[in-house]
């Protein structure tokens, strides 16, 4: 994920005015989550997704996706996660116009098979960074990159600023407006959807990662973002959703705003005319991306939540945050950041994918030994992966380690599933109401999915608390 030092310089005074406009709602408390539907499965159960992005941005051609291994999914599941956002690249899938790589599709399928083995649901993300390989990155193929001869200057120390290079911005305009490129992008999605429609691990399709566009003369960044979202991204998403539906009418389509929403700006996206749409913003703070510590007094999380919830409330669609997580996770205030960020995400979203599950430093979730890097262990907590009924209350107290779910059981097929990460003390499960489980306790050091069944129509309370340390 890039550093985003460029964004605040371009937004300037207009952003300050917009943040001031949303401050009263933030001051009144967290945004009201009512009106945002939850993600559901084909049995009607309410879903919660917790997981990570998985990627290989380095290898191409015969080596494409080789950095993603079965270990990624085994280790994620061992910590209780049930979701992965898989980055795939159009330039690898269709390196020459009209010639799709069967080998690349097989590599994707192998990864999906691993995910299925470990019961992890996958969002296939058509990823781009700074448009694609024409500018030294990944995403849209070079044959689909048109710049009209405009200049491009690399910025290796701040690559996100390359989005504001004239050639990159013009390439986005052509992608959105040129009829042949529109058709090519739609064909690419039909190929993916047709191949993976019936794969059990596939949850949905993220139609494009962090889309950007071209600023007009005299236009500030917030105004440009809203215009691009309204008049270019909305039609594109409707075209691509139609393309997916020509092959797959069951899985979800995920749509992203521009990355500018990270500054607490509401999206300008219009209606996506599809029955299974998920709003999938990213959750990054410019200052933290540039290396700063979390500033609790700035009110950024509150402003972001107030802004990002407006669109899904209006459109009545679920929210899944597709990327989030700071680069420097061990700074003094980062423990508080994780607590407050996770609490915020739980208020309005159906889940999230942290950035990124890899083994090392930087953004990696875990180190070379597979141990969580500082503060990232907070992402592994109890949650209700699936609820067979209407959720009344869903809370987790990180201080006591106690999780509580209250729901009104429905007569649908399937059980309520509580995902528990490994704990040094294990877990105890208590039920209140006409309900039963075969797993009243979970041993120390083991992740577990606890299944609860209840009498249809009854109110059930599930309380999970730490067990007795060994």
Question: Regions from the language model: what does each represent?
Answer:
Residues 1-27:
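Secretory targeting and sorting signals
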Residues 30-36, 423-426:
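A short, compositionally biased
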Residues 33-49, 53-252, 257-265:
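Active-site mouth of glycoside hydrolases
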Residues 58, 285-287, 358:
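Short loop/turn segments at secondary-structure transitions that flank enzyme active sites
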Residues 86, 434-436:
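Extracellular or exported targeting regions of proteins
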Residues 140-143, 270-273, 338-340, 370-372:
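Short, hinge-like loop/turn segments at secondary-structure boundaries
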Residues 158-161, 280, 330-433, 443-470:
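Aromatic-rich peripheral "rim/lid" segments of glycoside hydrolase catalytic domains that contact
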Residues 215-327, 346, 350:
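Glycoside hydrolase catalytic-domain groove-lining segments
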């Amino acid at each position: 994920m890039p550093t985003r030092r460029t964004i605040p310089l371009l937004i300037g005074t207009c952003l300050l005015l917009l943040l001031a406009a949303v401050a009263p709602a933030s001051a009144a408390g967290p945004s009201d989550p009512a009106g945002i539907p939850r993600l559901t499965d084909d049995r009607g159960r309410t879903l919660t997704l917790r997981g990570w992005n998985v990627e290989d941005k380095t290898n191409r051609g015969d080596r494409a996706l080789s950095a993603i291994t079965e270990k990624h999914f085994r280790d994620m599941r061992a910590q209780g996660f049930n979701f992965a956002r898989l980055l795939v690249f159009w330039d690898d899938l269709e390196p020459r116009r009209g010639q799709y790589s069967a080998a690349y599709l097989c590599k994707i399928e192998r990864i999906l098979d691993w995910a299925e083995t470990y019961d992890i649901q996958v969002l296939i993300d058509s990823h781009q960074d700074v448009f694609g390989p024409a500018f030294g990155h990944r995403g849209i193929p070079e044959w689909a990159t048109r710049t009209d001869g405009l200049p491009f200057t690399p910025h290796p120390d701040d690559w996100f600023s390359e989005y504001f290079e004239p050639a990159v911005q013009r390439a986005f305009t052509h992608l959105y407006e040129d009829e042949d490129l529109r058709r090519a992008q739609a064909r690419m999605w039909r190929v993916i959807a047709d191949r993976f429609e019936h794969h059990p691990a596939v949850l949905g399709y993220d139609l494009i990662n962090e889309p950007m566009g071209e600023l007009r003369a005299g236009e500030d960044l917030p105004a440009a973002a809203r215009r691009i979202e309204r008049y270019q991204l909305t039609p594109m998403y409707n075209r691509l959703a139609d393309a997916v539906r020509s092959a797959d009418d069951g899985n979800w389509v995920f749509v992203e705003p521009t990355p500018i929403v990270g500054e607490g700006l509401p999206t300008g996206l219009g209606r996506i005319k599809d029955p299974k749409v998920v709003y999938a913003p990213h959750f990054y703070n410019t200052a933290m991306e540039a290396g700063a510590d979390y500033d609790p007094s700035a009110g950024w999380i509150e402003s972001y939540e107030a802004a990002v919830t407006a669109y899904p409330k209006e459109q009545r669609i679920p929210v899944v945050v597709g990327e989030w997580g700071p680069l420097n996770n061990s700074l003094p205030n980062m423990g508080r950041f994780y607590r407050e960020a996770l609490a915020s995400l739980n208020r309005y979203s159906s889940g999230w994918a942290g950035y990124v599950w890899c083994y090392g430093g930087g953004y990696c979730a875990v180190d070379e030994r597979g141990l969580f890097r500082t503060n990232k262990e907070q992402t592994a907590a109890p949650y209700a992966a699936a609820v067979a009924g209407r959720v009344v209350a869903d809370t987790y107290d990180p201080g006591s380690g106690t999780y509580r779910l209250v729901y009104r059981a429905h007569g649908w097929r399937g059980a309520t599933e509580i995902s528990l990460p490994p704990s040094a003390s294990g877990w105890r499960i208590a039920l209140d109401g006409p309900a039963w489980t075969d797993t009243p306790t979970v041993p120390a050091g083991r992740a577990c999915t606890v299944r609860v069944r209840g009498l249809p129509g009854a109110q059930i309370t599930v309380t999970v608390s730490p067990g007795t340390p060994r």
